[in-house]
């Protein structure tokens, strides 16, 4: 019998348009530059190498709403969700976590 792998959603949650959570000073960027979620990406690679099934979802980069993010998460059916957070967006991030 094949062992079922844990599915892990690595999420950079939705927030304000053009909000760069991964930058040195998380904020809405004037030029529209959004840094990719470096630490989530590193961790996703480590988890995949260890045999976990993962999905890295960068909601700000894809301009996803909370509803669209929740739909993608539900379709993936993760056993665990890892959320990237920042002080500037923490209340929103908690709300996203509660929705999922």
Describe each region flagged by the PLM.
Residues 1-100:
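A short, structured N-terminal alpha-helical element that caps or precedes a catalytic domain
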